[in-house]
Amino acid sequence: MLLTTLVVGETAPSTTLGTMIVVSGAFLILMLLLKKYAWGAIVDILTQREEKIANDLDSAEQSRVAAAKMEKERQQQLLSSRSEAAEIIKNAKESGEQTRQKTLKETTAEVTRLREKARTDISQEREEALSSVKNEVADLSLQIAAKILNKELTPDAHEALIDSYIESLGKANETR
């Protein structure tokens, strides 16, 4: 209707201007009432919302910083754990090598000791055998000498004496 009045040039009925004044007055009254009763509450709600958003942003930033810090600490702990594991492995290898070296030395010493003992035992047995042979030869020599002194030997008697003595030696060795 207003458009027709402006475009066509018709005169507007008087009710349109009155309606505009009433609507404008009602709008002003509504604005004043809103300002007096509701504007403070609306501004408070908007302020609270703004503060909440700001707090949420701050909280998100703090969470991001805390997460970055925790990630850095986790990385440091991981590196520390890896270095500790490498140190433990290194120590275990060194300990194993030391144990191996110690066992090798002990085994070598034991083998050397056993060889030396065997040499000593063999030497002692040989000395005892030689001593025994010497004693037997001496006894045999004394027995032969005693038999010779007791008898006057002719070549046949001498041969018979040697044969009997050899037989007695054979019997003595068989009994041992």
Curated annotation (Swiss-Prot):
- The name under which this protein is listed is ATP synthase subunit b
Q: Name one GO cellular component term.
A: plasma membrane
Q: Give GO MF terms, alphabetically.
A: proton-transporting ATP synthase activity, rotational mechanism; proton-transporting ATPase activity, rotational mechanism
Report the gene name: atpF
Q: Which family does it belong to?
A: Belongs to the ATPase B chain family.
Metal-binding keyword on record: no
Question: What's its membrane topology?
Answer: Single-pass membrane protein
Cross-referenced InterPro entries, in alphabetical order?
ATP_synth_B-like_membr_sf, ATP_synth_b/b'su_bac/chlpt, ATP_synth_F0_bsu_bac, ATP_synthase_B_chain
Localization (cell)? Cell membrane
**Record keywords: Transport included?**
yes
Q: What does this protein do?
A: F(1)F(0) ATP synthase produces ATP from ADP in the presence of a proton or sodium gradient. F-type ATPases consist of two structural domains, F(1) containing the extramembraneous catalytic core and F(0) containing the membrane proton channel, linked together by a central stalk and a peripheral stalk. During catalysis, ATP synthesis in the catalytic domain of F(1) is coupled via a rotary mechanism of the central stalk subunits to proton translocation.
